[in-house]
A protein has these predicted regions:
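Extracytoplasmic small-molecule ligand-binding "clamshell" domains
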Residues: 1-61, 69, 152-153
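Solvent-exposed coil/turn segments that connect beta secondary-structure elements
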Residues: 1-4, 42-43, 52-54, 61-64, ...
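Short, solvent-exposed loop/turn elements at domain surfaces
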Residues: 4-10, 66, 92-94, 138-139
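A conserved helix-loop-strand patch within extracytoplasmic ligand-binding domains
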Residues: 33-36, 41, 62, 69, ...
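A ligand-binding cleft/hinge motif common to bilobed small-molecule-binding domains
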Residues: 43-47, 60-70, 138-143, 157, ...
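Short hydrophobic patches on amphipathic alpha-helices
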Residues: 49, 120-123, 163
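A residue-level marker of the well-folded mature domains of exported/periplasmic proteins
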Residues: 101, 140, 149-151
């Protein structure tokens, strides 16, 4: 993708860099092959693989059942929990949702469901900017539909700019 630092991004010279690039280069070296890096908009990343435009995807992609129906995954190589980001001066900046530091949606019991309910109440009427075709968009549609106004973006950098400009309450 080239737009998801620190995992992958284009530097000022237009070259890909980041943790996934380093990881991929090391894998190519160990396999004794030359790898060519290409960028692809996120919402087309799986379709382009299926069309044979490249051989593998190395991207901050969560392994979901829906995606597993289309492509094969290796063992995950990195984990990064999802979270909301808001401006420091936002009323949302100091939320304490059910006293929980994190909520595991894969094992959402009563306490997790209560936390999601509190989050929905706190975010009611807010605008949340999110990259399209992501698990984050799926979360908003599943858990916060009707409570928040969702604005979709092609790249993380774009929604971050809108957060900084005050055009959304959270990303």
């Amino acid at each position: 993708e080239g737009a998801y630092p620190p995992w992958n991004n284009l530097n000022s010279a237009g070259e890909l860099e980041g943790a996934e690039i380093d990881f991929g280069n090391e894998a190519c070296k160990r396999m004794g092959v030359t790898c060519e890096w290409v960028t692809q908009d996120w919402d087309g990343i799986i379709p382009a693989l299926l069309q044979g435009k490249y051989d593998i995807i190395i991207a901050g992609m969560s392994i979901t059942e829906e995606r597993k129906e289309k492509v094969n995954f290796t063992t995950g190589y990195m984990t990064d929990g999802a979270r909301f980001a808001v401006l420091k001066n936002s009323g949302l900046a100091n939320l304490n949702i059910a006293g929980m530091a994190k909520v595991n949606l894969n094992n959402a019991g009563g306490k997790e469901q209560a936390a999601i309910g509190q989050l929905i109440a706190a975010m009611d009427g807010k605008t949340v900017c999110v990259q399209s075709s992501t698990i984050h968009q799926n979360f908003l549609e599943k858990h916060m539909s009707g409570a928040v106004d969702v604005k979709l973006y092609q790249a993380v950098d774009d929604h971050n700019l809108d957060l900084a400009a005050g055009r959304c309450d959270a990303v």
